[in-house]
């Protein structure tokens, strides 16, 4: 009997026993770093001479892994293996597939500290964030397994005299998962195994910055007994194999999390019907945000400042849900800004192995991009806090606050994906909502208010997929906060929702006459 879903807990690091346990996990993981990792096609491990080097963004001298780089021929071999595996996998019952996924999640649960420790090194994640990432991966797998069980019998439709009708779901085929580096386990595992539990086959192309943690999932899937070829692991250069994966005539769906530029490219290319393709491809894309916290008048300014700072600087602002815009009523603007600066000064920045609040940004390209935006911010507004950068050993950017901005400034319009938040002053709540909606994105947002009428207005008019009252705009929880956004934030395919698996299923109707 499958027990009721409940979220996987993290570790309480105020308890010394948990601190000691996680330090041991970090030491154990460090001993294994630097190894070569293969492609995995039809269960076969294939080592290639050409490699992708994964490094610790907090200490660029430390190599995490050398991932074999797939070629187009490797991808072609993976599609052949996938199509063969599909013949058998699609015949498994929904319950059998779901039960196997529950076994996967049980293995991850036992290895949660190890999985989290890897992300501390490979993604520069702080301890709490890394553990939360691992726990969220478990949540996704557990939630989707139960969702598939719920969908197993289809949905009721009407019969009539002499006619019996059935409405049920069937799998689609082979697809491609392209996950991000910022949630290298949770999103990677969720977007890979959601289609799998629905009866499909996946080619997994991990993020170039975080292939090692994705390879660890492959080992767990093998241990759990997933048949060969159901998930094929093809790390590689997106310039070499990215379009090939998306364009392939056997790609039935693409799940992507990443930049707007790449997401729109995938969307466009997926619309083209290739020779030998007799179906329309599905794209499930999450492409980022320019998320805002709106602060009304007559509110708890301490709560507002805390919401802004934690949402802006958690994991160094490298969340698609991170607060990059603080839109504050003129009556409390100065006080909220001052308190936000004070809280920001208390944050620790450094190598996350040492359990700092903030760690590095992921790579040199992001470091340079964020550094450039800070300079733009200095021109458009006033640098209130932070702004410093240091790439002498790792890619470190201080938590940065820029005030005195206008809605059309680049700092307020363009996704930075780093620890930078801009403040803009507004005259009233109507203007605040106008400014909040004044971007191409619509992922998350939050409103700090004690005015119920204003909250109702925000619910109706704040154009985001996930809206929160009197809290920050990050930290969606599987089962409670199905996650996905509007406009250029993506296709609003709500992860962790009762509807998510429908993206990987076809609906079939069978009518039998008597």
Curated annotation (Swiss-Prot):
Its EC number is 1.2.1.88. Pathway: Amino-acid degradation; L-proline degradation into L-glutamate; L-glutamate from L-proline: step 2/2. GO terms for biological process: glutamate biosynthetic process; proline catabolic process to glutamate. Pfam families: Aldedh. Keywords: NAD, Oxidoreductase. The keyword NAD applies. GO terms for molecular function: 1-pyrroline-5-carboxylate dehydrogenase activity. It catalyses: L-glutamate 5-semialdehyde + NAD(+) + H2O = L-glutamate + NADH + 2 H(+). HAMAP family: RocA. It comes from Staphylococcus aureus (strain MSSA476). This is 1-pyrroline-5-carboxylate dehydrogenase. The active site is at residues 286, 320. GO terms for cellular component: cytoplasmic side of plasma membrane. Belongs to the aldehyde dehydrogenase family. RocA subfamily. Coiled coil: none annotated. InterPro entries: Ald_DH/histidinol_DH, Ald_DH_C, Ald_DH_CS_CYS, Ald_DH_CS_GLU, Ald_DH_N, Aldehyde_DH_dom, Proline_metab_enzyme, RocA.
